[in-house]
Every structure is written in structure tokens, then in C-alpha cells.
């Protein structure tokens, strides 16, 4: 009976470790949307604009500007954590 418990624990540990190794790693840092990319009508059109800029950008935000009826697309990118910046 004891060996059954040990084997069950071993299988559970192996399953948990494999799930952790397979799952995508979280990006260290925060998403900042501060690069203007022109005007937009919706978030989906802004995402399309920013995705054409390359791998450094991860979508975009369509934000209202100071002019009525005009929205500005801001492309988003990840900024490293403060610990990462200090190591540079």
C-alpha cells in the first residue's frame, strides 16, 4: 500500500513539472503603449498597424486625442523590470 502512495506522488510531481516546463514563460516587465503610429478607428485597426512594425511591438491601443472625433494609435512594447535595467 505504501508503494502505491509513493508511485502516485511521483506521477503527480512529474505531471506538475512537465506542465510547468511546457507552459509559456511570462514576460518579465510591463506593457507600455507610448509609440504613436498614426490615427485609428478601433483597437483592431491599431493592432494591425503596430503588428506590421515588427516583433518589438505587442499590439496597440486606440486612444482619444485632444481633437474631437480623432483617435491616435499607440503601439505597445514590453519594458524590462527595474532589476533587469540595473544589471545593464
From Swiss-Prot:
Cellular compartment(s): Secreted
Any Gene Ontology CC annotation: extracellular region
Disulfide bonds: 33-76, 40-62, 46-73, 50-75
Signal peptide as annotated in the record: 1-29
Keyword set, alphabetical order: Antimicrobial, Disulfide bond, Fungicide, Plant defense, Secreted, Signal
GO terms, biological process: defense response to fungus; killing of cells of another organism
This protein's record includes keyword Disulfide bond: yes
Family: Belongs to the DEFL family.
Protein name, UniProt field: Defensin-like protein 98
Taxonomic placement: Eukaryota, Viridiplantae, Streptophyta, Embryophyta, Tracheophyta
